[in-house]
């Protein structure tokens, strides 16, 4: 069984109301796509316990930001942040090709661009709220559909 099927199966079998399950999942998505890289799991566990949310649903939401989404998501989030608050003074964004990701020069350049942290933070915060707002009704619909069929 694939990872995605196992995750969906776990979410659907959570012994809770569809609303609480969907809310927990949406909060997990909010945390999982937040700008706090490296803290997502700890934050998910803490929030689930602190607010007595469904822990399985929260963690599945947190882990929906899988490793292969990190670079595309946070790149897009930085772009969104730049569109919202503007490009910091003195920063010039070059055209980047996919093949550049495999060049040492690109990573050296990227490491010197710490001024992009604020746009990345703002962009990922905005996108995580949007994704959570989409996740709640979607998860609610799926869980209700499953529970009515069982």
Task: Describe the function of each predicted region.
Residues 75-103:
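Juxtamembrane non-transmembrane "cap" segments at the membrane-aqueous interface
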Residues 34-47, 51-77:
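Transmembrane helix boundary and interhelical junction motifs in multipass membrane proteins
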Residues 1-12, 150:
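Short, Lys/Arg-rich, polar N-terminal cytosolic tail immediately upstream
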Residues 102-118:
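Membrane-interfacial helix-loop-helix junctions in multi-pass membrane proteins
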Residues 7-30:
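Small-residue-enriched transmembrane helix starts and helix-helix packing motifs
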Residues 84-89, 138-150:
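Membrane-interfacial segments
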Residues 20-24, 58, 116, 120:
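Residue-level signature of transmembrane alpha-helical entry/exit and packing/kink sites
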Residues 119-144:
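Transmembrane alpha-helical segments in integral membrane proteins
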């Amino acid at each position: 069984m694939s990872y995605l099927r196992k995750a969906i199966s776990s979410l659907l079998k959570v012994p809770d109301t569809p609303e609480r399950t969907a809310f927990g999942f949406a909060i997990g998505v909010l945390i999982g796509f937040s700008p706090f890289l490296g803290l997502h799991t700890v934050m998910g566990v803490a929030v689930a316990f602190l607010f007595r949310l469904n822990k399985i649903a929260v963690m599945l939401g947190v882990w929906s930001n899988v490793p292969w989404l990190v670079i595309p998501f946070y790149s897009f989030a930085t772009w969104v942040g730049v569109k919202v608050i503007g490009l910091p003074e003195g920063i010039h964004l070059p055209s980047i090709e996919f093949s550049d990701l495999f060049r040492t020069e690109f990573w050296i350049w990227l490491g010197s661009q710490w001024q992009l942290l604020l746009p990345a933070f703002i962009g990922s915060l905005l996108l995580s709220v949007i994704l959570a707002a989409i996740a709640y009704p979607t998860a609610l619909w799926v869980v209700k559909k499953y529970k009515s069929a069982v």
